[in-house]
Amino acid sequence: VKIVLNTSPIIFLSKVNSLKLLADCIDDIYAPKAVIQELHEYTLPAFIKVRPLSATGEAYVQGALGRLHQGELEAIVLAQEIAVDYVVLDDLLARLKAQRLGLDVMGTLGLLLFLEKRSVLNAEQAWQKIQQLTEQHSMYLSPQLLQQIKIQLLGNIFNTDTQH
């Protein structure tokens, strides 16, 4: 599996001590230069390869700046240029743009579920990390999505509704 990361997934995964786990199940992990510049106090692990864009890609990013940040645009362009399996973006507009361009998109939540699917995390650990992100680190997920993920990971044992 080959991915390009945007800034927010790197930050969110770092906050729940999961960034380093990606190396256990993803072959090639890339980030564009703009993402590295946006990280400020975060140190990028050596397994994340920083790749510059082509001159054409740079020109596209400069012309497209506006509703999306430079890091998001560079991640999308880099994903196209090096033909990755997923571009990892959390921002809805960035995800929609990437999908319109034919890219497969995953977010931080998807990466945590991928880690669980690959048995790098167990279901309970994955759920705890998702809870930490939503309760302590300002990641917004709708209550409906949280419930779906909880059931997917932990089963229906927490459902307190009873039918009569």
Question: What positions do the PLM features span?
Answer:
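A general alpha-helix detector
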Residues: 78, 111, 129-132
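Short active-site-adjacent structural elements
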Residues: 96-97, 123
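A generic short alpha-helical patch detector that favors 3-5-residue windows
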Residues: 103-104, 121
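Long, charged alpha-helical interface segments
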Residues: 118-164
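Active-site-proximal, substrate-binding regions of enzyme catalytic domains
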Residues: 1-86, 92, 99-103, 144, ...
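Short alpha-helix plus adjacent loop in nuclease-associated cores
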Residues: 109-120
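Short secondary-structure capping/turn micro-motifs that flank functional sites
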Residues: 95-96, 114-115, 132
